[in-house]
Amino acid sequence: GSEMCIRDRQEDSELLDEVVVIGYGQVKKGDVTGSLLTVKPDELNKGKQLTAEDALVGKVAGVNIVPGNGAPGSGGTIRIRMGASLSADNDPLIVIDGVPVSNTSISAINPNDIASFTVLKDASATAIYGSRAANGVIIITTKKGSADGTSRPSFNYNGNMTVSNVYQYMDVLSTEEFRQAFAEHANAPETFKLGNADVDWQKEIYRVALGTDHNLSMTGALKNMPYRVSVGYTNQNGTLKNNNYERINASVGLSPKFFDKHLSVDINVKGSIENNQPVSTGVIGSAISFDPTRPVYEDYEGNVGLGYYTWMNSGKPITLAAANPVADLELADKLEKTKRSIGNIALDYKVHGLEDLRFNLNMGYDIQKNDNRENVPDLAPSMYTGNQNDGTGKRYKYHQTKRNTLLDFYANYDKELKDHHINVMGGYGWQRFWYKNNSVTTDTEGKELATPQHAEAELYLLSFYGRVNYSWK
């Protein structure tokens, strides 16, 4: 027999009428001509989200988040359709509340502040941003306050605690198996005779890592001015000892309207402070290959090795041998401190008497400061490298400042005439990119060990852009 299927099209119609964010404006989903996908908060990944990238993993076809080195706060590399170049930059353009930002890290954005991701994939969708969008565009819209008729603030808190550990160590010889293998090659020189210890070096470098994440937001309205204020605190230990990541986030959003709602204003300010204590991932390889019959700690004449076992030959450290991985973890003092603020003020004016025409002005900034340091004391095992400064410790400092500013002004005309709908947009954009960095490496007494580095650059981007959309029912 035959079957008749009757479908209710109401839901599909509602989806087509849904408004989505695109470059320099919003359109109904049914009028979109390019390839884009919007991911909303209830569609994002749940549970632990240390960075904004975590919320997007596996949610958009063709978007891959390539994991970092596994350390807390390392984030991931975003690729849309896996990029297009073997040698050039494959990073997509990231736009946060109308402000294009660097894709080096979007950790300045608290995942709990994100209202939606819009991913623009193909040329027709990304063309409005020019050549810098050749690898796609990700538009991040943050949460706003809502004028729901009440001035009472509402509070929201969420937090979590995590426990992480290494599920399985690399399979290596036990101390007994190592001794048996060594006995089969008993002609080894005296320098490499076995020790008397029994050390599992992987257990010495790993730990059970604890993490906490707390987020508090307040939403409300003051005399019909919606606002949202949020703060967040994240502290995550790495499974490698001495590895830690700490982040403090804060954001403020105001959305007042004036002149009988003809002028809409959006003010967004976001800030973050990140303190990252990285460790060398090379200690993992050292722990796998290090002699399990050697102790973690041992004293030598002249305090060589600072109390940690060090490979020695005739009373001198062997420069070509792997350094004690525990010493590398505990003696290297590393800190990467990042302060960042992203903000903008956007004006949307609906012309009196000609309300199909709107003028938009967006002024924004992205300011970032990085201060990195690495201190290793004299006589540390890793400082014996066979050069003229053998055993000399080091002091490394790096400072970078970035200041990016922008101004966008565009007009948007949107008109519906019976079955016809036309949207015309045209505008002008100005951006300034400036950065300065310097670094210096000295010994523990301040003597330079390398030539100090300094760089400074200033770039400008001027653009004229436009778009015409026409649809007929």
Q: Whereabouts are the PLM-identified features?
A:
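Exposed, low-structure sequence patches enriched in small/polar residues
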Residues: 362, 465-473
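Short, small/polar-rich motifs associated with maturation and membrane association
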Residues: 2-272, 279-280, 342-343, 449, ...
